Design a protein with these regions (language model features):
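Short, glycine/charged-enriched hinge/interface segments at domain edges or termini
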Residues: 1-69
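Short glycine/threonine-rich loop/turn motifs
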Residues: 42, 48, 52, 66-178
């Protein structure tokens, strides 16, 4: 890190030596993508409460040129969420996003359903607030799936907002990255 306006040449050379052949900066363009969203929760599926998450999520996606082309609303059951995931997998979407059911309550089955659907889980949990209950996984074909905690709806910037640009630029995200 260079604080002053000038730096000694030997310090700059040392930084170059440490970096080696690794580029200091690489740019990956955003790629237009499609997303499928699965809204989980019996209270939303039954119509008892209005889905206020999806409209906010659509705005966040649109900022990166991502179009939500599929949307399913299902109850809290493990099989219902896994079935909706399997259905969206047939739609050849660029990513699948699940909202609801991400905390530690007994009826929060979204993480288990994502795992049951065949995704390889990169992480369930992130050392970032807000967003500690974030889930990221990939299917064998490279399609990402994310479980989004409720904070994505309320907070301007969460772990999702840090990961989404990388996913949009086709940069794989590893557990080490998170």
């Amino acid at each position: 890190r260079v604080i002053p306006l000038i730096i000694a040449d030997e310090k700059l050379r040392e930084a170059e030596r440490i970096a080696g052949d690794t580029p200091i900066l690489s740019l990956h363009p955003y790629v237009r993508k499609t997303a499928g969203v699965i809204t989980t929760g019996s209270e939303v599926a039954s119509g008892r409460i209005q889905d206020t998450f999806t409209p906010i999520l659509q705005k966040k996606l649109a900022a990166y040129g991502i179009e939500m082309t599929e949307h399913r609303t299902v109850g809290d059951g493990l099989d219902a969420v896994a079935s909706a995931t399997a259905e969206l997998r047939t739609k050849k979407l660029d990513m699948i996003l699940c909202t609801g059911g991400m905390s530690v309550d007994p009826d929060d089955n979204t993480p288990g359903a994502i795992k049951q659907s065949g995704a390889h889980i990169v992480t369930y949990g992130a050392p970032v607030l807000p967003g500690a209950m974030f889930l990221l996984g990939y299917f064998d074909d490279g399609q990402p799936i994310m479980g989004l905690p409720g904070c994505v709806m309320y907070a301007k910037a969460t772990i999702f907002d840090l990961i989404l640009p990388r996913v949009t630029a086709n940069v794989p995200v590893t557990k080490r990255d998170i």
